[in-house]
UniProtKB/Swiss-Prot annotation:
The gene is nas-6. Disulfide bonds join 114-265, 135-154, 300-334, 307-327, 314-331. This is Zinc metalloproteinase nas-6. The keyword Metal-binding applies. It comes from Caenorhabditis elegans. Zn(2+) binds at residues 162, 166, 172.
Amino acid sequence: MLDHVLLLTYCLVSTVVRSQPSADVFRSFAGYIPEDHRVTHHEWQNSGKFQGDIDGVDPNLLKLPEGPVLFNALKNKQLTWEGGVIPYEMDTAFSPNEIKILEKAFDSYRRTTCIRFEKREGQTDYLNIVKGYGCYSQVGRTGGKQEISLGRGCFFHEIIVHELMHSVGFWHEHSRADRDDHIKINWDNILPGMKSQFDKISAVLQDLQGENYDYKSIMHYDSTAFSRNGRNTIETVENGFTQVIGTAMDLSPLDIVKINKLYSCKTKKKEKVKPATTEEPHQLIPQVVDKNSVDSGEKCVDHFADCPHFAQYCTRASFFFVMKSYCPFTCKHCPGDRKLKKSG
């Protein structure tokens, strides 16, 4: 219930005109945030699909020691999109604001990979983006009119980027054949009838591309996915990352590397990406800004005195834009600010 209230409140707040923040709206938003609540999006769990949001899959075939590579675009290059161009058509039911959020997700791929989402111009194979029930997609290019659903509760940047990455050709990170070396599944905490959502995909069907397991992947389940009691269903083997998995707001550095490998993208940078599992977890701590360092002629100030109290939400996916708009000083979103540093 709390997740739904938070979601509704976020949607309301995010549409407020930024030039004149509403004290009532902000206080309403802030009042719903408990001190220890880690916000996650579970709308995709309600789609009734394989692993919550994957459409067009027979789970039994995926678990066979040998089977048709048809179901995994990573293993079968024939199921990738030619030239990295993904044609799409969009449901007319989407609002202008929803379209804007969707286009921003497209842009995440354009800026970091050779993937291009382009409006369909008669192509046979294309994405049909609809306002269906729940959030779900198919993996890779399955042929013809291919549905991707972004229903109620799905219009968050990170959710859309996640679903689009399925379409690009990727499974969930937790379903990797080598996942037991990196995470522990707490089977007793999983909802009845939902244990199959944590099945591994056979190595025969899945190409790991020689890349490390990525706790920070946009494709990772969060720690309480399909939980029957609010306790962790997934815990990381490496200390400090249980609260990191499933909280990505965008493509991780390794997500980008994997996409560019799959599509043989020509990248401008030759830098080697540091494996996500060797980094220290980010600490969600209040950020301090020197007002004198602001380059803009305008003063960068918080709009409410309570902002420092909610500093931990500056980097939470669900509240990022709200906090940026209402608490720019606390959240270090002033012109000229240095990037958020990790503690320690």
